[in-house]
Regions:
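N-terminal amphipathic/basic-hydrophobic helices that include classical n-h-c signal peptides
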Residues: 1-36
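Short loop/turn segments that flank or connect secondary-structure elements
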Residues: 28-76, 80-239
Length: 239
């Protein structure tokens, strides 16, 4: 008796859909967790930088006495656009998110002022008005020197004269007022140190970041976000 041979048909084995869905959700969760952990680490490191700079500011404030006239409601340094790096931008966005959780109306006010500023400034913005990144080079620097010098910062509350994101303000804001050394020498706010001699001003010099921690953190932030280059406050607070 001859046996009839049947050709075996391969059975395509597929993982059950619920199992695949679980695997996908787990992978997404792990990815999101890693992103959040990296972001938290960056925020923690930035907090260390802020503490270092604020400690230096407290020290120079004590040494300067009445020569340093910075006070709530003094807004001269809040007028005029200035470049900020991606570490500053990250800190500002985090501060705006925190304000959103406690005072959503005030946060929306910041966003509205930022959007209005972009609408006014985009036509002459010395960079990419879509990404908000400033152009680099001597010509770009020359154009920026004449750009938005009378534009108030979107974080400035026009009713109170206070900064809505004071604890998250950029490094430029944190060191404006006391004597700080740059490539051009020792600079000081024109409202401060009236009557002080050059020697007295030099004795109050602020050294905000002696180990240049900011550069190290900026490199990490740019690698994490994939965005490099400077922007202005309005572009990082508009959305």
């Amino acid at each position: 008796m001859r046996l009839r041979r049947f050709r075996e048909t391969p059975v395509k084995r597929e993982l059950p859909y619920p199992y695949l869905a679980t695997v996908i959700r787990s992978a997404i969760w792990l990815y999101d967790t890693k992103i959040l952990m990296r972001r938290d680490f960056l925020a923690s490191d930035d907090h260390v930088l802020v503490q270092i700079v604020d400690t230096a500011l407290a020290d120079v404030t004590h040494r300067s006495g009445e020569w340093l006239v910075c006070r709530p409601g003094c807004t001269q340094c809040c007028i005029g656009a200035f470049p900020i790096n991606q570490l500053d931008a990250m800190r500002l966005r985090r501060g705006l998110a925190e304000l959103e959780s406690t005072a959503p109306a005030r946060a929306e006010g910041v966003r509205a002022r930022a959007r209005d500023a972009i609408a006014r400034l985009s036509a002459e913005f010395p960079g990419d008005p879509v990404s908000g990144l400033l152009d680099e080079g001597d010509e770009a620097s020359r154009r920026f020197s004449d750009f938005a010098n009378d534009e108030p910062c979107p974080a400035l509350d026009p009713a109170t004269g206070n900064c809505e994101l004071y604890e998250s303000r950029p490094m430029t804001c944190r060191v404006f007022g006391p004597p700080v050394r740059s490539e051009d020498g020792l600079g000081v706010c024109e409202l401060c140190f009236h009557g002080a001699t050059d020697k007295e001003i030099a004795a109050c010099e602020m050294k905000p970041d002696p180990d240049d921690l900011e550069s190290t953190l900026l490199e990490k932030v740019e690698k994490f976000t994939g965005t490099r280059g400077n922007t202005i406050v309005a572009f990082c607070l508009a959305s």
